[in-house]
Amino acid sequence: MTTAPTTAMALPSRGRVGMACMIITESALFTIFVVAYLYYIGKSLSGPYPRQVLDLPVLATVALLSSSITITLAVRALRGAQHGAFNLWWFATIALGAFFLGATAVEWDHLIYQHNLTIWTNLFGTTYYTLVGFHAGHVTIGLLLLGLVLIFSLAGAVRTAHAERVEVLSWYWHFVDAVWVVVFTVVYVIGR
């Protein structure tokens, strides 16, 4: 009786497993905030209300979603040992994310100083700033991590051998982008 040779299945790296676990955990937290936002839509006893003060952040959304493309191109460039292209695409990702974060800051300035909407104003203000702020916090963390990688790369410390680690970090950025699609839909489409 002959047996077929068996091949060992490679286990995913600790980085991949760790990032996947973190994304699952963060997804649960975002789900709680999204459900709370949906539950409290229209329950504020006083204004301002979403339809009165929220504009669609279209350019910011396009910038953030485009950053998923640029980070994918950066990872591909690093895998192909194209370090100049990696730095360019990685920088583009940071620039697009920074534009998104800046647009969020401008929106908040407008809401606070022109519409007097703060986290304490009403249920809408509380749930809006909690959900959108939680996302903005994740964008900020992502930008800091992306910035560190760029600094190391410009110093020559990021090589093709680091492509898997860079790709794992890109998963976080894709997660931040995917969460924004949900937040945008809930806050700016359904919630208005």
Stretches found by the model and what they are:
Residues M1-R192:
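...captures the hydrophobic TM-helix bundle architecture rather than a specific catalytic motif
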